[in-house]
Structures are given as C-alpha cells and as structure tokens.
Design a protein with these regions (language model features):
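Membrane-interface "cap" regions at the ends of multi-pass membrane proteins
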Residues: 1-32, 61-66, 70-83, 87-91, ...
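A generic transmembrane alpha-helix motif of multi-pass inner-membrane proteins
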Residues: 379-401, 423-457
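Helix-loop-helix connectors at the membrane interface of multi-pass transporters/channels
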Residues: 2-4, 78, 111-140, 241-244, ...
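Transmembrane helix-boundary motif of multi-pass solute transporters/channels
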Residues: 13-53, 235-238, 249-252, 256-259, ...
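Inter-helical loop and helix-membrane interface segments of multi-pass membrane transporters/permeases
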Residues: 5-8, 37-41, 76-95, 108-165, ...
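Select transmembrane alpha-helical segments in multipass membrane proteins
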Residues: 10-21, 45-49, 87-101, 147-152, ...
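Membrane-water interface regions at transmembrane-helix termini and the short interhelical loops
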Residues: 37, 41, 67, 88-103, ...
C-alpha cells in the first residue's frame, strides 16, 4: 500500500480534467478503428448502438473510476488497496496499473509511423506514400521505424516530465481545440467529394437490416478504446480532480467530446473512402492498412490531397500524443505512489520501459519478424494481451470493487459531493452492479475466441 506522504498533483479545475480525460479517449482507436468497425458492422446501426452504450456502459465506468480516484487520491494500486489488504484487491489494482505500461510502448510505435507519414506529406511525397508496398517496406526497415518511434517517445516523455499542470493540462488545452478544428475541416472536405453522400448516409442513418449481435459486441469493445476505461487512466486522473469539480458533469462533457470526435472521424474517412471505392465499404480495411495504405491512396486521388494529408496526419499525431500522454501519466503515477519516487525519476523509468518494449514491437515487422508469440508479431501480441484479455478483467475488477467492497452508497456520496443530486443514479446502479460486468465478460470471451479462430468477428 502507498505509504509515501506527499502533496498530490491536481488539475487546475474542470476544464483541465475534461480536456485531459477527453484527450485520453481521443486516440488512434477513434481515428481508424471506429470508422472501420462502423463500416464493417452496419454503419448507422453501429453508431446508434455505440452512442447508447456510451451513455450507459461508458458513462458508468467513467463515473466509477473517477470517483475511486478522487476518493482515495491514489493511482490504481493504492486506490484498490485503500479498501483492504486482500490479495484480490491488490491484483485488481495492479492489473489496472500494468495495462498502460504495456500499451504505451507499442502505441508509440504506431505514433512513430504517423510522424513518418506527416514528414513525407510535408516533403510533398504524397504519390510515394500511395504506392503499393510503401508501408510494408517502411515498417520492415528497422532503422527508420526505430528512429521515428524514439522521437514519438521523447515527445511524450518530455510532456510528462513537465508535470500535470505545466505538461499534461497545458498541452491538452492547446492540442484538443486544434484537433477539433482539423477534424471539422477534413470532415467537411470529405463529405463534399463526388459520391461521398452515399458514405454519409451509410454511416449516419441506422438500418435495422444491418443489425447483428456482433454489432453490439464490436461496439462494446470499442468502448474500451474510445473512453479509456479499464486502463487505470481515469482512476489516476480522478485522483488529480478537485473536490469541487462535478464528476457527473465532467463525465457528460467527456462523453460529448468523445462521441463528437468519433462521428467526425467517421465523416472524415467513410465518405472519402466510399467516393474513392465507388461505394464499397469493404475498402475500409482493419488496422494500420486503413490509415497507412488506403487513406494515402484516397488522398492521392483527391484535389489538394497533399494539404489534406498534412492536416490529417497532424490531427492523428495530436490524437496519438494526447492518448500516449494519458497512458504514460498513469504509469508514472503508479511509480510515484508505489516506489516513493519523484516525477522525474519515475518518468525516466517509464521512458526506458517504452524504448525497451517498444523496440520489440518496432522490429517485429523487420529484423525480428521470425519471432512470434502465439503466432502473433510482438505488436499484435501486446495489443491482444492488453485489449482482449487484461482490460475486460480490469473492468470486472472495478465493478466488483464498487459493488461488493466499497458499496455503491459510498461511491454515490463521492459523486454528489457539492451536487444537489445524482441525475443518472438508476442507470449507474444497474450498469455497475449487473450489466457492466456481463458486458466485460462477453468482450473477454468473444475477443479470445476470435483470436484463436473459434469465432469470426
């Protein structure tokens, strides 16, 4: 348990918390994973399901994690251990704490790819980026990918090194408004392309014929990516939240911000790809191939493609950085609390871990391509381990902590501190005690089954 008594860092107020939490949620998963899933699982019906889940499942988890953090003023390990010495409580805290430590290294590798593409667009090499084989050639080049990866890591670490207010909050206040403006500009340009309206209709208008159970499962899985739940981030950020900051109002603002950016991401990508492909949603492939192969081809066939490419990858870089900052801060907070170290020493340690683990993922498509775990490259394995296994378990642990250990009454007291009432109390109670754990179990089993080929998602 954390026995180190020192002043806890804090956000300056509600705006600082909301922008930092929203920045954590708006990452690479929102920019390329959300549009891909929306295209694959029914467009408008997927969007509708996602919004409903954000207002219930996502809302309840954000509120719970933020309340736990503010109540204890500790990072995940100390927060869980504040309520008892059980080994299960310790395990619940540590799994929340370890997740960001494992995610941020491989996440930074992809961030490095974004830097490379942004540089090439600035140099005017949009045609080169659209060529078949360019992406595979780049990621198999160990030196080039490692250099870009290290640059991304150094930017992230430098911001964390500066502290909560001078680093995280200040950067979020600059990056998030720019990100919004860029997303609006690109979305407007995308939806006005010839043939793009079919993509707009597919994405925004629900069609019950496209509904399937897998649409629900996929939308639930996207919740983890989009809202940064079950990563320890919101517990950490909650511990920096002032008592006079409304948890419920802040959560609502994060929901609005995240949903708006997710919709913008869909409008940036789906209509443009529809116009490029003649209305074939299958062109929206999964994973890196969408952002680093398909999108450059789309931009190469558009007027002002180079300019749009620069704006798009600048937007993606900002989104990647705001999320990597949140992930890294959660890890640093754990080291500060559990090891009694200062911010600078803790930041250096996570920087070393990022470089060490990230290098495995970075070289996994090149010099280390022959080395696999469960048939997966290093990056794919770390992604599977954290997102498909650890995060659902962390969510279940948080739900059990709230409903079985702390008690929903005490959590409610923390939520309504300084408030007249808990407006979505009934939704929260039903979700956190019953439905959220069930949803997390469904995600866990379906993701593992899909990874081993037992089902196809």
């Amino acid at each position: 348990m954390n026995k180190h008594n020192k002043s806890r860092s804090s956000f300056s107020g509600k705006i600082g918390y909301v922008l930092a939490a929203a920045g954590a949620s708006v990452g690479l998963g929102n920019i390329w994973r959300f549009p891909y899933l929306a295209a694959k699982y029914g467009g408008g019906i997927f969007l509708l399901i996602y919004i409903l889940l954000a207002l219930t499942f996502g809302y309840s988890m954000i509120v719970a994690e933020s309340a736990i953090g503010r109540m204890t003023r500790k990072s995940p390990v100390g927060a869980f251990q504040s309520f008892g010495k059980s080994k299960w409580l310790s395990a619940g805290g540590w799994i929340n704490a370890i997740i960001p430590i494992l995610i941020v290294p491989y996440y930074s590798v992809i961030g490095g790819w974004v830097i490379k593409y942004l540089i090439e667009y600035v140099k005017g090499n949009s045609t080169l980026l659209a060529e078949d084989g360019y992406f595979s050639g780049f990621i198999s080049n160990g030196v080039s990918t490692e250099l870009c990866f290290v640059v991304f890591c150094l930017i992230t670490v430098a911001i964390i090194y500066a502290g909560v207010r001078n680093g995280i909050e200040r950067v979020s206040k600059v990056m998030m408004p720019i990100l919004i403006v860029l997303s609006v500009i690109i979305a407007v340009y995308s939806v006005t392309r010839p043939g793009a309206l079919a993509g707009v209709k597919y994405f925004l208008v629900p069609n019950l014929k496209n509904f399937s159970w897998m649409s629900v499962v996929a939308a639930m899985g996207q919740m983890f990516y989009s809202l940064s739940i079950a990563m320890g981030i919101l517990i950490t950020f909650g511990s920096y939240m002032k008592k006079d900051t409304s948890i419920e109002d802040s959560t609502r603002n994060v929901e609005i911000f995240d949903t708006a950016i997710a919709i913008m991401a869909g409008l940036m990508i789906i209509p443009a790809v529809f116009a490029f492909s003649g209305g074939n949603p299958d062109t929206l492939q999964a994973g890196p191939s969408l952002m680093f192969i398909t999108i450059p081809k789309v931009f190469a066939n558009m007027g002002f493609g180079t300019v749009i490419g620069i704006l798009f990858f600048l937007l993606v870089l900002f989104a990647a950085l705001t999320s990597s900052i949140a992930l890294t801060e959660s890890a640093v907070s754990t080291f500060e609390d559990e090891l009694g170290w200062g911010r600078k020493k803790s930041t250096v340690l996570i920087g070393v871990i990022m470089i060490a683990l990230g290098t495995l993922s970075c070289l996994g498509y090149g010099p280390l391509s022959s080395v696999t775990i469960l048939g997966m490259q290093f990056l794919d394995f770390f992604d599977f381990l954290t997102n498909s296994v650890m995060m659902p378990i962390a969510a279940i642990a948080t739900c059990l902590l709230v409903s079985r250990v702390i008690g929903v009454a005490k959590i409610e007291e923390e939520i309504i501190h300084g408030e007249s009432r808990f407006r979505r109390k009934k939704i929260f109670l039903v979700m956190i005690q019953y439905l959220c754990p069930v949803f997390a179990l469904i995600i866990l089993f379906s993701s593992v089954a899909n990874a081993f080929g037992w089902i196809t998602m």
